[in-house]
Amino acid sequence: MTKIIFMGTPDFSTTVLEMLIAEHDVIAVVTQPDRPVGRKRVMTPPPVKKVAMKYDLPVYQPEKLSGSEELEQLLQLDVDLIVTAAFGQLLPESLLALPKLGAINVHASLLPKYRGGAPIHQAIIDGEQETGITIMYMVKKLDAGNIISQQAIKIEENDNVGTMHDKLSVLGADLLKETLPSIIEGTNESVPQDDTQATFASNIRREDERISWNKPGRQVFNQIRGLSPWPVAYTTMDDTNLKIYDAELVETNKINEPGTIIETTKKAIIVATNDNEAVAIKDMQLAGKKRMLAANYLSGAQNILVGKKLI
């Protein structure tokens, strides 16, 4: 069986790892260190580590791979192939050169579009109607290696980061399973990326999460979809942060002051943007409160919201 080092961290990576364990010989798993999670800051292993532990696989968790003791240990292994999926670190050249068949990456976009750490988020934020999976050879430059295989998938109007993450995770494992035999047999072909067409999807920053209502409704709607259910777009109402998990677009008869609550219904808080498409907030969370449907919030506040300004 093909001896593989797998490198990945979040839930997206676990589907790929499970497939590799079933089909090949995974001799080591490399992932990020355990991190404190939640209000109580409980040290929690990354999802990939949990899968590796279930199968009693050796796990390496360097804070930074380059120059680490873990790297030296990995370089001693007899390995055929390195597979990465959302690992979160660049690989040093010494590790890229180690496996006989090279190092490949499962990336959640149609490269060269959306190189970087947040391709699913950015595709939705930008209003793309499709994205996909790319299997590519790894090089020193980020997400710039030759493309081995690609498969596209449609982004539906009601998709958000959560739903697309789950679809792409399955697609990534399936496409890798189809692609690996030709890589192992040495019969695959690969094509260089056109660097002139490259776009980038950097990790989401806190400032990217704040909603600017002085934009077209479609842009605000896509921002909400593209950040839900994590890290979640937010605005401010009465000096209190308000996270918005779900919304929809509604037509308005006139353009109102952006950010103004122009109407409430039984199920939504309708907020003006800078065009005639308003955003109807349906699922929300006020700072310090539990997440709730707008309908539940409105049962006690419907009559006092119209005219308020979100900033």
UniProtKB/Swiss-Prot annotation:
Is Transmembrane there in the keyword field?
A: no
**PROSITE patterns per record:** GART
Query: Signal peptide span per the entry?
Result: none
Write the Enzyme Commission number(s) for this entry.
2.1.2.9
What InterPro entries does the annotation carry?
Fmt (IPR005794), Formyl_trans_C (IPR005793), Formyl_trans_C_sf (IPR037022), Formyl_transf_N (IPR002376), Formyl_transf_N_sf (IPR036477), Formyl_transferase-like_C_sf (IPR011034), GART_AS (IPR001555), Met-tRNA-FMT_C (IPR044135)
* CC annotations in GO: cytosol
Q: Which Pfam families match?
A: Formyl_trans_C (PF02911), Formyl_trans_N (PF00551)
Residues recorded as binding (6S)-5,6,7,8-tetrahydrofolate, renumbered to this chain, are S109, L110, L111, P112
The catalytic activity, as recorded, is: L-methionyl-tRNA(fMet) + (6R)-10-formyltetrahydrofolate = N-formyl-L-methionyl-tRNA(fMet) + (6S)-5,6,7,8-tetrahydrofolate + H(+)
Give the record's keywords alphabetically.
Protein biosynthesis, Transferase
What family, per the record?
Answer: Belongs to the Fmt family.
**Name assigned to this protein:** Methionyl-tRNA formyltransferase
Protein's organism = Staphylococcus aureus (strain bovine RF122 / ET3-1)
Species lineage: Bacteria, Bacillati, Bacillota, Bacilli, Bacillales
